[in-house]
Amino acid sequence: MAIPTILDTDIGHDVDDVWALAFLLRCPELDVKLITTSTGDTVYRAELVAKMLQLMNRADIPIGIGIPLDENPHTHDVWLDNFDLAAYSGTVIQDGVGAICDTIMQAQDQVSLICIGPVPNIAAALARQPDICANAKFVGMHGSIHRGYLDAPKPMREFNVKVHALACRAVFEAPWEKVITPLDTCGNIVLEGERFMRIREAAEQQGPASPAAICLDNHLTWFEAVKDWPVLQHLDPHTQSSILYDLVAIYLGFAEDLLDMRSLPIQITPDGKTLIDDNGASVRCALNWHDRDAFLDLVTERLVSAT
């Protein structure tokens, strides 16, 4: 039976959320009950989600608008074009935090709560309804244990943790099952070579509503919007993806086989570090890959599949 799933996403800044959502919608192991938008302009983020769901014939999935915190650049405007939430044929819930609480409390089975951005929505849901811990597993793309960005041999303050560190701390201290992919395993996920060529071919053959085309079109237009970012100076957008951190969290929503998982006591510091500390809460951390190529092949196969 498919696992009831909620995705909380800050889609609309880095493009990896788009790839992650497309992959999620091609994972039969996960039954998506709700998608909520996190931080920044959460209506803009919801519009991106809505357009993707509409194109992929998944307007059965409700969208919850999360707490609008911080400024964020609209890096996906070209792809979004003039689409707005009024065009979405599904349900839009203004109280995204309430929708998280209701969806978890009403679920018959444990929910995979997959979070691929900062987590103020989740901290607010815990404050409003602490009992969600009894019926949900937190799955996050968060932190840095032994390695940092670009495979640096030391941990770093990871974005999803540091921008709202106290919210993240509350989520990690909550008494529920916690599973994360830190930068150690998600910071080197790139589709390139033959895999990227297959994405391009599928996009051309299957048309703009296909997951491959949605990912590729967003990738190319996003790159034009952010090509001045220093980290992208050596990226050729026609031959490879950017780093697709969030894909690994989707996989952890239903499987762990390809990863080396370790239970560690994790403490989130006020300045956004993810520390191993005996006083921390137990978190299952994906520290290394058993077979990263198999994971990249799985993602590619599902994104190029026509059904």
Spans of model-derived segments:
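N-terminal acidic, glycine/proline-rich low-complexity segments
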Residues: 1-307
